[in-house]
Curated annotation (Swiss-Prot):
It comes from Vibrio cholerae serotype O1 (strain ATCC 39315 / El Tor Inaba N16961). It holds the Pfam family ATP-synt_DE_N. Belongs to the ATPase epsilon chain family. It is a peripheral membrane protein. GO terms for molecular function: ATP binding; proton-transporting ATP synthase activity, rotational mechanism. The keyword Flavoprotein does not apply. Produces ATP from ADP in the presence of a proton gradient across the membrane. It comes from the Bacteria. GO terms for biological process: proton motive force-driven ATP synthesis. Its main location: membrane. Keywords: ATP synthesis, Cell inner membrane, Cell membrane, CF(1), Hydrogen ion transport, Ion transport, Membrane, Transport. This is ATP synthase epsilon chain. One of its GO terms (cellular component) is proton-transporting ATP synthase complex.
Amino acid sequence: MAAITFHLDVVSAEKKLFSGLVETFQVTGSEGELGIFHGHTPLLTAIKPGMVRIVKLHGHEEYIYVSGGIVEVQPGTATVLADTAIRGEDLDAAKAEEAKRRAEERILNQHGDMDFAQAASELAKAIAQLRVIELTKKRR
């Protein structure tokens, strides 16, 4: 029996990172984790920094880091419009670790709510990148 699939596009302002048939994908929405399968109810929601986990035909997986954006689901198709999107294999672990260290340092030395909010946002992005790197390495 053939797997039930639908079309997914993952795009950023710079380029299209993925376009093809998928069995499912997961993304971090504004209200939590979303798992999207064929036949999902139409949806338009914000996404948080994190990963898009794509399950292609035959269970092959791909991971893409997104810094935020929106996801739109329509019958037979879905689109992730990301502010920034980077394939897992293109992420730099050393840069992500350094960004995490700097954000943690800023949180400890913050001066006001805006400093804290900005540092917390940077920390979330760095942690998300490190998670995508880890999952991409495990996949190989």
